[in-house]
Amino acid sequence: MTVAVTGGSGVVGQAVVRHLLEAGRSVRALSRSASTADVMTALGVTPVRGDLADYQSLVGAFTGCRVVYHVAGLNRMCPRRPDELLAVNVDGTRNVVRAARAAGVERVVYTSSAAAIGEAAGTVGHEGSRHRGYYLSHYERSKHLAEQVVLAEAADLTVLLNPASVQGPGRATGTGKAILDLARGKLPVLVRTRFSVVDIDDCARAHLLAEKAGKPGERYILSGFTMSIEEAATLLESVLDKTIRARYLPRWMALGGGLMVEGLARLTGRQPRFCREMVRTLLHGHAYDGTKASMELGFQYTPAESTIRRTLAWFAAEGLLEIPNPA
């Protein structure tokens, strides 16, 4: 039976599509534009025109599919238009689950985010964590609200996955860009924080397993390992056989810097690369427990060093990083 995928041209979406094809599945991918359709065709899937904002197009795209993988979403920090995050992540998700039901879909696998957990500072987030009661970023808010929509309207159909920071070959944006800059020595100023990571292949594999073994209406955090920024730098030094020099900013200086850069961006009309919500998120840090997904879905997480080595090797293959031995 054919499955439908939203967000198939994104980093996680492409990994999910690849794993579906390797499993011998027939894949139909939602495509907003001709360029996206070309990417999907090149991957070996059938592109179908549709848009998260167009409910009827989603019904048409999902009709005849038993399963929908809703991977599409907008992940953006320091947004100039926070309403765009709500439109895509909340309203778009509402359209997806409603269209899936109307089209007779039996299972929706929804790619949420570990950010939606909202764990309190200094704690390890798990599926049952109580939200702290305030948001660190517009992105977190949008994903938390989207989960509420899914659980209110399609808990009987939908398995929710909450990936931590997804890293691996194919990603050089967001946290992936920070890892690249740190490896290249172009991130000389850091803040002390911790973060959880899931390997991109583990993330994709978990999506397929969630279709079969996931319980509708339940969350599954995907988190393979957690490390501090100091531990990440040490691991990069070991793999690259080089010294990484960085200065750690105190909290007050980081917050002040975010405010200043954000203010300058408003004056110039440019998109800030750094802002207060980014600093808040970094200073809060994130640690997640991915045990439930591993145990109930049935897979083992990739070790941290393996994920980092594969990521650096991909950077090198793409000409983004010079390393002595990318193997």
List the model feature ranges, each with a label:
Residues 87-139:
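Conserved Rossmann-fold NAD(P)-dependent oxidoreductase catalytic core, especially the SDR/UDP-sugar
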Residues 77, 114-123, 166-172:
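Conserved catalytic-site region of short-chain dehydrogenase/reductase
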Residues 95, 145, 174, 191-211, ...:
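Substrate-positioning beta->alpha
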Residues 157-197:
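NAD(P)-dependent short-chain dehydrogenase/reductase
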Residues 3-23:
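N-terminal Rossmann NAD(P)H-binding glycine-rich loop of SDR-like oxidoreductase domains
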Residues 122-161, 165, 187:
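Catalytic helix-loop patch of NAD(P)-dependent Rossmann-fold dehydrogenases
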Residues 35-91, 99:
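NAD(P)H-binding glycine-rich loop region in Rossmannoid oxidoreductase-like domains
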Residues 206-273, 290, 303-327:
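Mid/C-terminal beta-alpha module of Rossmann-like enzyme folds, strongest
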